[in-house]
Amino acid sequence: MSLHFQHITKHFIVNGTPLTVLQDIDLSLHAGELVAIIGASGCGKSTLLRLAAGIDTTERGRILIGERPVRGIPDDVSLVFQEPRLFPWLTVTDNIRLGMLNLNLSPAEVERRIAHYLQMMGLEGFADAWPHQLSGGMAQRVAIARGLVSTPRILLLDEPFGALDALTKQQLQARLAEIRQQTNLTILLVTHDVEEAVFLADRVVVMSPRPGRISRILPINLTYPRDRTSTALLEQRQAVSQALHLADAVEV
């Protein structure tokens, strides 16, 4: 499913004064594409995801899922945050079950999906665990499973690995790359991590500081699976880093 941002402008009111967070964002994601957005803190990256998820509204422009304007929270879009946001009184299984709360599924299909995504996210043996018994990485696996269990067409990821240690982060990045290859999900990833963006994305969108505008879009012409240590990937990392530094240096 394609996702289109058409001339999006967004303001917040701060101390009675309008603050422009996003300005004239024009971006399209093709079906099955993974696009990473990178930029300085406060440039509106997470706001863009909230708009696509129907959690927030825009003053100007429109967002389309396929040819359908986003009005309210779309059924075929899932949003995963940096914090797992698991309910502490629910087991891993029941936290994942929440992702299907509004779906009209048979009990057998609900259980089949839970088992499938437990396996996909490497959570076998943790089905009956409580959130306080999980490491940060395992909790984030549960959050991603909850986001996937409704079988969305579009997955929005808001720095999902930002709070994890380096090894766990790389493991979950590799798992996401595998999931992306196994499905036709359209994925929009917000990150501060240049290596993560280049390792995962088909294109990297570099944002300028607030008000957030698209400074540059860089295609990542690397085949999957990707080697983090390859010369080609390191060159792409350098190109994205340079574009990011240039965007930060521009007076807006």
Annotate each PLM feature.
Residues 38-40:
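The feature captures the beta-strand-to-loop junction immediately N-terminal to the Walker
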Residues 53:
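Helix-to-loop junction immediately C-terminal to a conserved catalytic motif
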Residues 61-73:
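Conserved ABC transporter NBD signature motif
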Residues 90-98:
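Short coil-to-helix segment of the ABC ATPase nucleotide-binding domain corresponding to the Q-loop/switch region
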Residues 97, 101, 108-126, 178:
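Conserved ABC ATPase "signature" region
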Residues 129-132, 150:
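Conserved signature/switch motifs of ABC ATPase nucleotide-binding domains
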Residues 144:
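Hydrophobic anchor residue at the start of the ABC signature
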